[in-house]
């Protein structure tokens, strides 16, 4: 079945079921910060690829090519966000040999046609964007391992790519070797089902904080534990930072950022590349004060 037909089915089947996802998107805070020079430099370094999408859309892919490419990360930004906003982390991954390919979703405030789409469109168009991005990577980076990563609403997308099954049905990609999820979209009623994570066998690293809330919607940070707790045991890790909020991936202090960088890089090397030394570092990792680390 083509992506176009699949998305047409989504538009009908999910019109009411995805209302909680819309509520989350409307409630999710959108940080407003003056651009920092390193981020601006990172954004300017992207190659942009425009690809056709269903219903006459085009998808803008930001591609940050690693000089010595070892694998490719498909990254999905948070609601209303944009790929370059995560330059602090993504630039480090690129330096470690992970090319980053990141679509600009229609819910982004930087999308040129943002006003043409309501929040209801965010879910289905994101699914299509990421399928197109993966197809692009398979065609242009043939043979390179694929890793899915994302933040907030984008982390839900990465979990779906890794095998999580929402009300939309199974949409996972068996080529995904590992998932790195910063925060999550929480337990969205009507979208996240009791068995949503039952088939999430892909190695998954979940990163959150005990102040990771979305005002008026996610009132208990423990909801971000669900992908870790409700997926099959084996190759799952959870990092929880004391006092960290929903923007941890962007606003972490140097010590927390360094831990996230080391852990995500080792995780991608261990499971994306089959690197035994990286796996040994993960196994030996201990959490510093103010951070909890769980494995299952």
Language model regions located:
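Bacterial N-terminal signal peptides that target proteins for export
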Residues: 1-10
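An N-terminal hydrophobic leader/cap segment in hydrolases
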Residues: 10, 14, 18-63
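Alpha/beta-hydrolase superfamily serine-hydrolase fold, recognizing
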Residues: 28-41, 66-68, 139, 144, ...
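Serine-hydrolase catalytic machinery in alpha/beta-hydrolase-like enzymes
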Residues: 46-143, 147
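Glycine-rich His-Gly loop
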Residues: 75-79, 152, 209
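Primarily recognizes the serine-hydrolase "nucleophile elbow" in alpha/beta-hydrolase
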Residues: 135-199
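The feature captures the conserved acid-bearing segment of alpha/beta-hydrolase catalytic domains
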Residues: 171-243
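Alpha/beta-hydrolase-fold serine-hydrolase catalytic core, especially in secreted/extracellular enzymes
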Residues: 243-245, 251-296
């Amino acid at each position: 079945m083509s992506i176009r037909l699949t998305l047409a089915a989504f538009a009908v089947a999910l019109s009411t079921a995805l209302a909680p996802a819309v509520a989350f998107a409307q409630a999710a805070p959108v940080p407003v910060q003056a651009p920092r020079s390193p981020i601006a430099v990172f954004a300017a370094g992207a190659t942009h690829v425009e690809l056709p999408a269903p219903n006459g859309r085009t998808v803008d892919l930001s591609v940050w090519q690693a000089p010595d490419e070892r694998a490719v990360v498909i990254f999905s930004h948070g609601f209303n966000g944009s790929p370059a906003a995560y330059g602090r982390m993504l630039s480090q991954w690129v330096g470690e040999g992970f090319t980053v390919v990141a679509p600009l979703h229609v819910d982004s405030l930087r999308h040129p046609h943002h006003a043409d789409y309501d929040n209801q469109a965010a879910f289905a168009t994101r699914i299509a964007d990421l399928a197109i991005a993966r197809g692009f990577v398979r065609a242009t980076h043939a043979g390179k391992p694929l890793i899915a990563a994302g933040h907030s609403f984008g982390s839900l997308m990465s979990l779906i790519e890794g095998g999580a099954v929402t009300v939309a049905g199974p949409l996972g990609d068996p080529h995904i070797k590992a998932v790195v999820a910063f925060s999550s979209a929480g337990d969205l009623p009507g979208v996240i089902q009791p068995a949503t994570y039952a088939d999430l066998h892909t190695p998954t690293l979940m990163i959150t904080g005990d102040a990771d809330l979305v005002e008026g919607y996610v009132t208990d940070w423990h909801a971000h534990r669900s992908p870790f707790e409700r997926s099959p045991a084996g190759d799952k890790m959870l990092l929880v930072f004391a006092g960290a909020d929903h923007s941890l991936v962007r606003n972490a202090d140097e010590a927390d950022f360094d831990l996230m960088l080391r852990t995500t890089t080792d995780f991608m090397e261990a499971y994306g590349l089959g690197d035994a030394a990286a796996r040994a570092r993960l196994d030996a990792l201990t959490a510093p004060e103010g951070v909890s680390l769980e494995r299952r």
